Structure formats: structure tokens, C-alpha cells
Amino acid sequence: MNVYVDQSVRALAAAGHRVDVFTADPGGLDGTGSGRVGGTAGTDAEAGMSAQLQITDAITLHHLPVGATTKDELADAIDELAELLNDRPDFRAADFIWAHYWISAEAALRAHEKASGSTGTTGAALGNELQVRAPIAVSMHTIGAVKNRDSDTSHERPQRLEAEARIAAEADLLVAATPAERRDLITELQAESDSVVVARPGVDHSLYTPDSQSAARERLGFADDEAIILYVGRMQFIKGTDVAVDALAELHERNPHLASRTRGILLGAASGVGVEAGGGAVRPSSTYLRELTTAIAGEPSVEVRPPVPSHLLVDYYRAADVLIVPSRSESFGLVAAEAAASGLPAIASAVGGLPEIVEHGHSGLLIADHNPHHWATAIETLLNDTDLRTELAGHAADRAERFDWGRTVAAVLDALPERSCASSRRSEALGAC
């Protein structure tokens, strides 16, 4: 999500808009002055406890100093976030608010309520106060009900499920990354169809480009004769990290000769919570990661590495032979799009937005289930067929050209007037017509 906010903010600024970014990322609350504020404004500057940081002439980062140190604690601080937003003149003066993730969206809606003295829906009888209020667009990024459905669990907290239903009813515009997410917003959250716009995320094509595999491998310390299988993302059940590990283990058993020159790189870290399938007990993601690493303890060819910044990540894409994206739920799959732009074909789950990026048999391979046997077969197929990999890589890079951040923000901005004017009293009160 940080990449999405970073790049969409830059695209808005490039289109001539002034952008104020508000973040309550706990990374800025370590009290040392060295914590990054989430990367949401796309800077490597250390913002620490600063209340405001000028990123460019057009982009300002505002830090909201709540006492939360985890995502769950942040969800319990939504009223505090709403108060802090209302205290910021730049928030009150905004012409348009684009909230990312359910916590931010709920905070923005509550900020409107608090400013107007309303305790119910923001859509009715709010008087003249809302005449100066900006319309709210929301990108969910993930939907709690969809995560429960796709992982066959009931893990997502009721607070989130209730908030997302309310957000779908009250936001002026819902931004879906793909037609599949649009369907989910309508079927799972009962959003009105005319309130949802599809705006496909983009890729930073100035960074993610095909380049020499050999040079990238030299920079990363990989040998030219190795077969590199890459996984990039959080180590979570929902992301299918266990499928990646089990598939690599099966490849080792099935084809020891091929496995002897294959290295699996898992690039990521534990985040949030991991869950068992079928409504099993919730386990901390750190525990899930330990179980994964224990499972591969005797496999020197499989290596877990911490996340890296984008300027290093592109070298991993260029150095690898295949990306695997075994997610159980995925609203889009930005990793697959970045890899494609870098000339790396993916083997991906046929879920969510991934089929928008990976065209089966043309720019990569799609797997309909999470059976490690099928994933190992797909990996083996691509590693044994250099010509096929090369063909898929070329098509993947071509297909990735459709993902452009300028088009992303244009789709959102173009949808605002039509939606706001169609939104009866609320949007009229907002002055959107």
C-alpha cells in the first residue's frame, strides 16, 4: 500500500495538484527522531516525530502523533485520528480526500461527522457545515470479508467488517483496482454499482525495466548458472508463503538434479497475523514464519531475506528466472506487475486481480489452486524451458505497459464529478456540482 500511496501522490503532483499526505504510521513514534513515516510520501528522508515534512513544492507529509504502535492499536484509535485530522487546516481545506485502507476511510468519515456535530451517517441533514466538506474517495486495498472468504477463515475483526460496510455506503467514490475487486465491493459490501470506479494501479516504469540478468546477479552475489525462484511479500498464510515453501521442497524431492542448482529466495518479513485454513486458531505471523523456516531448515537452497527498498528490489526481479505469487487472496498484485515490467514472468494464483497482470500461457502461468504439487510442476516446466521463459518474459514486459500511475489518478479524478453530482443531498452540500 505504501508504494500505491507514494506513486499516486507523485502522479497527482505531476498533474498539477497540491497534495497533503496524512499518516499515523507507528514508525514515526519511536521517539528517536529516526523512524520513517511509512514511506507514504515516497521519500527516504527520516521524518521521525516531525509534524510536517515538505517532500516537494507540491507534496507535504503530515504526521498524526497517535499512541498506537500496531495496526490493531491504530484501529482502536480511529476517533483520535479523526480529531487530529479536524485540527489540521490543510485537511479541512481539501477539495478532495482519497483515503487508503479501512482505518483511514473510517477516520475521514468520522472527521466529517465530528466537524458537523453529527453522530450518524454523513449523508443526511448535515446542514451548511458540509458545504465546505470535500468528497471522500476510498481505496480499500484489501476487504475483510473477501479475506475471510478466500482464506476460509473468520479471522477479520468484526469492527473492520462493520466499518467497511459503512464506508461502502457513505463514501462518495470507491476505487477498485480491478473489475474483480469492483464485483467484490458490490457483492460483499453491497456498494452501489455507480459508486465504484476501476482504476488499475501503475508501475514506476522509470525504475522497473528489463536489464541484464548477469549484471544484476553479480550485484546480488548470485551465480549465472543458478536457477533463481523469487517470492516477494509478507510472510503470511493469506499470501501463500507456505505454498511457496512446500512447492520448493517438492521440487527438491521430485528433481534433485534441477533442485541442486535452484535457489529459492523469499524476500519479505512477518506482518500482522497468520491463520490456519478452515477457521482454525489465529497464530501470530511471526510464529507462522518460524514454522516456515523450520520446515526448510535443512534446505540450504531456500533462503529468507528481509524486504529491500525498490532500487534494490528491481535487481532481484532482473536476477530471477521466475516469480511465484501463491496468494490466497489478492486485490491486485503489484509485485507481479513490477516483476513483469522488469522482464520477469510470474507463476501466480488465479485469484483476485492477478489474472489482470498474468495472462496464462502468454505472459506467465496461472494456478487454479494451492496444491504444492501443481506449483512445483509449473516451476519445473519453466526452469526446464529457457525459450518459453524468454517468450513469457517479453510478453510480460509488454503487458506491464498498461499499468501507469498517471492513468490511475486520472480515472479517479474523472469519476469524482459524476459520482458527486449523482449523490443527491450529500454531494450537493459538498459543493461538488
Can you name each region flagged by the protein language model?
Residues P345-A348, V358:
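Short hydrophobic beta-strand element within catalytic cores of glycosyltransferases
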Residues R328:
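Aromatic "clamp/platform" in nucleotide-sugar-dependent glycosyltransferases that forms part
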Residues P307, H360-G361, L365-P372, T381-T386:
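Conserved acidic donor-binding segment of nucleotide-sugar-dependent glycosyltransferases
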Residues G268, A277-V308:
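Nucleotide-activated donor-binding/catalytic signature segment of Leloir-type glycosyltransferases, i.e.
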Residues V3-Q7, A11-F96:
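A conserved catalytic-core segment of Leloir-type glycosyltransferases
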